Amino acid sequence: MPGGRRGPSRQQLSRSALPSLQTLVGGGCGNGTGLRNRNGSAIGLPVPPITALITPGPVRHCQIPDLPVDGSLLFEFLFFIYLLVALFIQYINIYKTVWWYPYNHPASCTSLNFHLIDYHLAAFITVMLARRLVWALISEATKAGAASMIHYMVLISARLVLLTLCGWVLCWTLVNLFRSHSVLNLLFLGYPFGVYVPLCCFHQDSRAHLLLTDYNYVVQHEAVEESASTVGGLAKSKDFLSLLLESLKEQFNNATPIPTHSCPLSPDLIRNEVECLKADFNHRIKEVLFNSLFSAYYVAFLPLCFVKSTQYYDMRWSCEHLIMVWINAFVMLTTQLLPSKYCDLLHKSAAHLGKWQKLEHGSYSNAPQHIWSENTIWPQGVLVRHSRCLYRAMGPYNVAVPSDVSHARFYFLFHRPLRLLNLLILIEGSVVFYQLYSLLRSEKWNHTLSMALILFCNYYVLFKLLRDRIVLGRAYSYPLNSYELKAN
């Protein structure tokens, strides 16, 4: 009616008359603002925090069976045998002969040109490849303990003899290599250690190292701050020699024990657990990468550096063998250092951490939004603002920092417990199928022999991966109600 007062439209009614979810769950606790009228003034309503009205459901974990894992000594022995077989195959690829020719050719009397092989180099490579096995023997003997003084003296003597023998062989081979080769070739002998020290030992996370010494993770926030404040002094006190000795010692140490998951209740403790697990995972991956590259370097690349210029060999096949050795060593070390129990631990921690999805500005403008708080456990679907950006909670339990990329990466990698295992099966299965294809297409005797020997080693690794995948796949697909559920 002209001149009369118009009633409010539907849009105005929906915005002013109905309280928003932000008012119902955010309120005056820092998670949102109060109800506002059209003039923008806040109406003071006593509103409880979001955690009092929307409580996320408890995180429930599946119980997986204890799958058999090779012991440290057994794995190092099998890994050493595999590397010796790969080294033998590489020497066949380099020094093979046409031994079926008539005997009037001097080089065709044997299948290999044994007179061209540098046995000092082969002995040096063998000692370098056996370093982990030797240290595993010493560690297992030390763990066994001594029942008597005689037993203790025998253990000490055996350890001394073993280390002395390895050191003597190493020095003897180095002296002979110095006499018969140029300085440029000799630089290749210690190249992996020269690369490892500057890349790895100067980038150690001292705070993570301090926190990882105790694996119960249930620490007070004050202790965390105190340990973080002492990081600077500890990092500065380390000189180059101590870092060098520490980094070299890590190459002989066995894998660190698997930590335990404590289902912490506090968001700070959850994030602290994730930081510790992230540092431990990065350390294990660093060891896997270095040891796999170290093995491939000494097995397949170093023999090529000492080949005489007059010696002909198939460069493509030798480089292909180098890649295969590295991939197989990577899968074997990953399977040993990242077992199914450890991956399940990372999955449980990722379930507590949660994930945030970044949204565009202007989207969800009419939906309730909250200010992110580090002391709040956010349920799924909640919109929060953090660092001038809008995020939506994706997991059922969210305590991650929205702007922290490492938290999002951690959740992406481990919120599905079989992701890493499926990746290893895909890599190893592709290698096995390619080697079978190459075996069927091979026409040279050294190609057939090398593929046949390597395939036997790969079958064992693929069998273990498929066994774990079948068992864990059924365990994780089982209904949660059938387990004895563990909730926080």
Curated annotation (Swiss-Prot):
Instruction: From the record, give the cysteines joined by S-S bonds.
Output: none
Q: Which UniProt keywords apply?
A: Autophagy, Endoplasmic reticulum, Glycoprotein, Membrane, Transmembrane, Transmembrane helix
Q: Which InterPro entries match?
A: Uncharacterised_TMEM39
Matching entries from Pfam families are given as: Tmp39
Does Membrane count among this protein's keywords? yes
Q: Which residues are glycosylated?
A: 31, 39
Give the record's GO CC terms.
Answer: endoplasmic reticulum membrane
What the protein does comes down to: Regulates autophagy by controlling the spatial distribution and levels of the intracellular phosphatidylinositol 4-phosphate (PtdIns(4)P) pools. Modulates (PtdIns(4)P) levels by regulating the ER-to-Golgi trafficking of the phosphatidylinositide phosphatase SACM1L. (Microbial infection) Positively regulates the replication of encephalomyocarditis virus (EMCV) via autophagy-dependent pathway.
What name has this protein been given in UniProt?
Transmembrane protein 39A
What is the originating organism of this protein? Homo sapiens
Instruction: State the gene name recorded for this protein.
Output: TMEM39A
